[in-house]
């Protein structure tokens, strides 16, 4: 079995969640499968093994799980990017586009130092609004965003292309055509 099929087979698809017409790609089944989880993290880390990566930034909430594992393997620090109002210390924030409206994310102002090399991690990229906001937030405080990594890309929704337009290399382990 190929890597792509192996990982795809551990992702559960839930139709009509959170609303009719949506196919929700659920990675909790991948996370529960020790072999698949390990393999996915190894593949996310592989291009940067031996490179100088200072921090891994994970987008709330599944990006925390994956980002922590990636940071551990790269011997890098981990930085949570959270919804506004969830961090206790002084923060820097960025608004980002949602399918219907906007939201705001933030991180601690001292979590990344100017010039530090950062990899952004989340479970899935769809329209790219959240990831684009995270890249802009990291750049706002002077980080060099080396890449953005995801388990899943939904290429028909254009998010990866949006990040590439910002000169951010994108690594996704699998893709699901359609929504």
Swiss-Prot record:
Principal place of residence: cytoplasm
Top-level enzyme category: transferase
Keywords recorded for this protein, A-Z: Cytoplasm, Glycosyltransferase, Purine salvage, Transferase
InterPro entries xref list: Ade_phspho_trans (IPR005764), PRibTrfase_dom (IPR000836), PRTase-like (IPR029057), UPRTase/APRTase (IPR050054)
UniProt xrefs under Pfam families: Pribosyltran (PF00156)
Pathway(s) the chain acts in: Purine metabolism; AMP biosynthesis via salvage pathway; AMP from adenine: step 1/1
Role this protein plays: Catalyzes a salvage reaction resulting in the formation of AMP, that is energically less costly than de novo synthesis.
Subunit structure as annotated in this protein's UniProt entry: Homodimer.
Name of the molecule in the record: Adenine phosphoribosyltransferase
Biological source species: Bradyrhizobium sp. (strain BTAi1 / ATCC BAA-1182)
Species lineage: Bacteria, Pseudomonadati, Pseudomonadota, Alphaproteobacteria, Hyphomicrobiales
């Amino acid at each position: 079995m190929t890597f792509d099929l192996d990982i795809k087979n551990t992702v559960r698809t839930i139709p009509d969640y959170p609303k009719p017409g949506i196919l929700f790609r659920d990675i909790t089944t991948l996370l529960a499968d020790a072999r698949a989880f390990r393999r996915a993290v190894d593949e996310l880390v592989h291009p940067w093994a031996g490179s100088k990566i200072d921090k891994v930034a994970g987008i709330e909430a599944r990006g925390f799980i994956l980002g922590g594992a990636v940071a551990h393997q790269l011997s890098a620090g981990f930085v949570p990017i959270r919804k506004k109002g969830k961090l206790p210390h002084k923060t820097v924030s960025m608004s980002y586009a949602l399918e219907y409206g906007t939201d705001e994310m933030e991180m601690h102002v001292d979590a990344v130092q100017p010039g530090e090399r950062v990899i952004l991690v989340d479970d899935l990229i769809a329209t790219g609004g959240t990831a684009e906001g995270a890249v802009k937030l990291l750049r706002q405080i002077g980080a060099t965003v080396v890449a953005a990594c995801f388990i899943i890309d939904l290429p028909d929704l254009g998010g990866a292309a949006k990040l590439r337009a910002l000169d951010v290399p994108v690594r996704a382990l699998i893709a699901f055509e359609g929504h």
